[in-house]
Amino acid sequence: MAYLFTSESVSEGHPDKVADQISDALIDNFLAFDAQSKVACETLVTTGQVILAGEVKSNTYLDVQNIAREVIRKIGYTKSEYMFEANSCGILSAIHEQSADINQGVDRASKEEQGAGDQGMMFGYATNETENYMPLALDLSHALLIELANLRRENNDIKYLRPDAKSQVTLEYSDDNKPQRIDAIVISTQHDDFDEEATMLAKIKTDLVSILIPRIKAKYPQYAHLFNDQITYHINPTGKFVIGGPHGDTGLTGRKIIVDTYGGKGAHGGGAFSGKDPSKVDRSAAYATRHIAKNLVAAGICDEILVQVSYAIGVAKPTSINVVTYGTSKVNLTDGEISKKVEAIFDMRPYFIEQRLKLRNPIYSETAAYGHMGRTPETVTKTFSAPGGLTKTVEVELFTWEKLDFVDTVKTAFGI
């Protein structure tokens, strides 16, 4: 029997994502000037205020206020009527030195024996239902908001958009788990107060259905067949959405972990990513398991896979590695046997994850909105500034965990 599955996304202007982006901008700046920085940074944003708190061990000093303001400005909170504006918001920093008790569990005389920064379990997932090996409902949810942000910045076809927005896509699947069509789309977008409420809501719905949706179909032609005139659209279903962003809802780092990962498919160990340097396995091991999952599916080992890894704080070797293929395995091995091969191919000690995926680089700001997974690897040049006139220009590789660079190794190991 056919069934429905739903995933959601939030825009870069959503208050929780504003917090994530500030936290990750701080991570990038610390790593740019001191690649061995240990950082855990949490951000709270609310009406006219930003509060930074966390623990740092680093040889660099940063102007954290300026970094936060630049992030807020880039997102688009640049007008006083938003009640949260880059130049005027207050910024309080309570960032302090990392606990020596925690640091002793990570630092080792031998780099290779670097301990995990915490206990916990992390998951990576991949499926062949999309070209980027991501769940389709989440991919579409992200795509809607990326294009909505493009429309906002162009300020041409739609002129009233504000930064805060959410999306949700419901797909109908067939008995054999193949996506058939889009059943429902929900979009809530913040907007200017430009007319009577009923008039505004009617125009917003008309504009999104007649402008945004055709742009999505043109930009993602592989999804065009899923759109038809039977889709139920819920556009700003609660009514007008003028008050939004951090003024409408307080935002916190790490509150959108399902949006960040697989949209409810697979599993999640509970640890957030943003604001954490790669010694925190919540982040680095989640990237590493995604890398494993994607390469196994791309190699033809299975159609769908979930990879779990777990750690004890201060211990380098994982306490477990487990694989679930949901009955889609193409090789004559049990999931337990596949797990053993994965363990032999991929060294999951924290230092080796950092080296394999080049994680001690300032690569995290780009992850903090529209998902950490399913993105396109690319090499970019970035320039950072610090007090005293210091600048640092670096070339870095983004989204290394999305590379299909182990496909041949996997095929050889599995004899295919």
Swiss-Prot record:
Positions bound to ATP: H14, D164, A165, K166, K240, F241, D249, R255, K256, A272, K276
InterPro entries: ADOMET_SYNTHASE_CS, S-AdoMet_synt_C, S-AdoMet_synt_central, S-AdoMet_synt_N, S-AdoMet_synthetase, S-AdoMet_synthetase_sfam
Compartment(s) where it occurs, according to its Swiss-Prot or TrEMBL record: Cytoplasm
Enzyme nomenclature, EC number: 2.5.1.6
BP-aspect Gene Ontology terms: one-carbon metabolic process; S-adenosylmethionine biosynthetic process
Keyword vocabulary terms for this entry: ATP-binding, Cytoplasm, Magnesium, Metal-binding, Nucleotide-binding, One-carbon metabolism, Potassium, Transferase
Free-text cofactor note: Binds 2 divalent ions per subunit.
Positions with a binding annotation for K(+): E42
GO cellular component, one term: cytoplasm
Cofactor(s) for this UniProt protein: Mg(2+); K(+)
Listed GO MF terms: ATP binding; magnesium ion binding; methionine adenosyltransferase activity
Binding site for Mg(2+): D16
Pathway: Amino-acid biosynthesis; S-adenosyl-L-methionine biosynthesis; S-adenosyl-L-methionine from L-methionine: step 1/1
Binding of L-methionine, residues: E55, Q98, D249, K280
Residue numbers spanned by region Flexible loop: 98-108
Catalytic reaction equation(s): L-methionine + ATP + H2O = S-adenosyl-L-methionine + phosphate + diphosphate
SUPFAM superfamilies xref list: S-adenosylmethionine synthetase (SSF55973)
Pfam family name, one: S-AdoMet_synt_N
Reported function: Catalyzes the formation of S-adenosylmethionine (AdoMet) from methionine and ATP. The overall synthetic reaction is composed of two sequential steps, AdoMet formation and the subsequent tripolyphosphate hydrolysis which occurs prior to release of AdoMet from the enzyme.
Subunit details: Homotetramer; dimer of dimers.
Stored NCBIfam families: metK
Family: Belongs to the AdoMet synthase family.
Protein name: S-adenosylmethionine synthase
